[in-house]
Amino acid sequence: LIGIAAAALITTSAVAPANAQMFGPGNGLVNDAAHALDREKWDKGVGLARQALRSGSLTPTNVPAALNNLCIGLTGQGHYDEALETCNRAIGKKPREWSFYNNRANIHFYQEKYDRALSDYYKALTFSPGDDVLITNISLTLRTRKKAAERVGAEGKIEQQS
């Protein structure tokens, strides 16, 4: 089962894209981490996800879910490099899971790397066609990228006039 958080973070330029937490069958730590992340309790979610990964009791199904949850928590904390590395590990374990690409795209969004974000959102759509979370995140990213380009264009015009 996948739980969806309506918004992960608020940025100065736009409402944040939605995350996709993973709830693992039969693993309390993975599920507790997902629940903490749903409530934007980043530190608690990261701690529980790390504890799950260190426990040695995860099934092969639970490992990618725990990595995904850790990725979300690290993103919420603003630790984008470590979050990106963790998302890549999750994708390596389960390369056809749309939510992993969604969450990696969110990191790119927060880093204002909108083309990379869109690439990952579109990749996620190949695994979950028509998904509402992905459509919303793509729309948000396109609008935010357009506003950023307009700002840069306006700043360039101001500099030229000076």
Task: Report each predicted region and the residues it spans.
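Helix-start (N-cap) detector for alpha-helical repeat units in TPR-like alpha-solenoids
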Residues: G26, P60, P64, W98-S99, ...
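Register position in tetratricopeptide repeats
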Residues: D38-R39, G76, Y110, L140-A148
